[in-house]
Amino acid sequence: MVNTTIKTTKSQEVFAAAQNLMPGGVSSPVRAFKSVGGQPIVFDRVKGAYIWDVDGNQYIDYVGTWGPAICGHAHPEVIAALHEALEKGTSFGAPSTLENVLAEMVIDAVPSIEMVRFVNSGTEACMGVLRLMRAFTNRDKIIKFEGCYHGHADTFLVKAGSGVATLGLPDSPGVPKAATSTTLTAPYNDLESVKALFEENRDEIAGVILEPVVGNAGFIAPDAGFLEGLRELTHEYGALLVFDEVMTGFRIAYGGAQEKFGVTPDLTTLGKVIGGGLPVGAYGGRRDIMSMVAPAGPVYQAGTLSGNPLAMTAGIKTLELLQKPGTYDYLERITKKLADGLLQIAKETGHTACGGQISAMFGLFFTSGPVHNYEDAKKSDTAKFGRFHRGMLERGVYLAPSQFEAGFTSFAHTEEDIDQTLAIARDVMSSL
């Protein structure tokens, strides 16, 4: 087992210097450990299920670059494909055959997607789909759910879960009220609230967007009938249904949450896994809707590095690896063992906890639960989670540094990794 005391002298030095160079010392807020306390770890390299910091400490990683690393870090086949692609250049700024290959793979995999547009991030994908849904319906208002995060575009920064720290409307200074005035919010898993919003705003709502499985308020699964109910309501009121599958796409099933639950939206956003660890995003859906995107139609969207050959190459190889027989059965088995084990250990060591998993995505809340929505999630003992996170980190397990983030496994994780993680969790929970 990893030592219970790690030395992080170099991490502290690097982070101290970073704070003079970048706001908060990071390029994305959650990395600063504000939610869990203590100094963040500065990492040096990754391989498989493991990550090493600048002090040489090794950790079992359950963050997975916040989702993309479903094959494990630096998979040799992905790296080899990237080496070959690099010889041809890093970016063309023009069409390439690689875009066709990945587009065909995405269309074949995801039930809702008949055409796809590649972008550079999940935020870009959600921005593009927002403009498209409004243009197609000629309506301005949208419904999103409390705790669901759809990137940092102004319209979406309303009750955006882990993406922001407050519950204000809007959630960030610098976002004018006008930018969020057309954003309606409802509690996740609450169909009656959604129906009420439709009734109050008849013929004004362009669509409903949601994470079909919430990952940015912690792990929250949809109640039975919730996704089906949204599909029925959007049909009834002439609105579009959009699944933000940036996190769940190719992770909880090869065809994403829509394959897993058998509910097909009109539009879908993707990211993370489809880039194999490189910056990427995509949005796609019905051909009649996607045909409105420029240059085929009037809805403008563009990007200098969109569809760049490196991201396309990594995405193609990652999806090829995921197609191997037994991959998702293995991910389900090891992740269930981890999630069930954490709950059992919490019970045996006297801690109130709830949580669960779907395929390679999991979560743990220090609250009695069940957690159906963001309000339930906020009842968690975040101080206890912070101590749990620090204890796990000091013993060589890297969890997401926030109670309100899902965890991720990969097919690089072994049964031994899970066993070691659970043994460490027992040690930590016994000392909380």
UniProtKB/Swiss-Prot annotation:
Q: Gene3D superfamilies annotated for this entry?
A: Aspartate Aminotransferase, domain 1, Type I PLP-dependent aspartate aminotransferase-like (Major domain)
Q: What are the recorded GO MF terms, alphabetically?
A: glutamate-1-semialdehyde 2,1-aminomutase activity; pyridoxal phosphate binding; transaminase activity
Q: Name one GO biological process term.
A: chlorophyll biosynthetic process
Q: Which GO terms describe its cellular component?
A: cytoplasm
For activity, the cofactor(s) needed are: pyridoxal 5'-phosphate
Show the InterPro entries listed in the entry. 4pyrrol_synth_GluAld_NH2Trfase, Aminotrans_3, Aminotrans_3_PPA_site, PyrdxlP-dep_Trfase, PyrdxlP-dep_Trfase_major, PyrdxlP-dep_Trfase_small
Enzyme class label: isomerase
Q: Which residues carry this modification: N6-(pyridoxal phosphate)lysine?
A: K272
Its annotated compartments are: Cytoplasm
In terms of domain of life, where is this protein from? Answer: Bacteria
Task: Extract the signal peptide range.
Answer: none
Q: Which UniProt keywords apply?
A: Chlorophyll biosynthesis, Cytoplasm, Isomerase, Porphyrin biosynthesis, Pyridoxal phosphate
Cited Pfam families: Aminotran_3 (PF00202)
Query: What's the Enzyme Commission number for this chain?
Result: 5.4.3.8
So what does this thing catalyse? (S)-4-amino-5-oxopentanoate = 5-aminolevulinate
The question of whether Cytoplasm is a record keyword is answered with yes
Q: In which pathway does it act?
A: Porphyrin-containing compound metabolism; protoporphyrin-IX biosynthesis; 5-aminolevulinate from L-glutamyl-tRNA(Glu): step 2/2; Porphyrin-containing compound metabolism; chlorophyll biosynthesis
Which family does the entry's similarity section mention?
Belongs to the class-III pyridoxal-phosphate-dependent aminotransferase family. HemL subfamily.
Tell me the subunit arrangement: Homodimer.
Q: What is this protein called?
A: Glutamate-1-semialdehyde 2,1-aminomutase
**From what organism does this protein derive?**
Nostoc punctiforme (strain ATCC 29133 / PCC 73102)
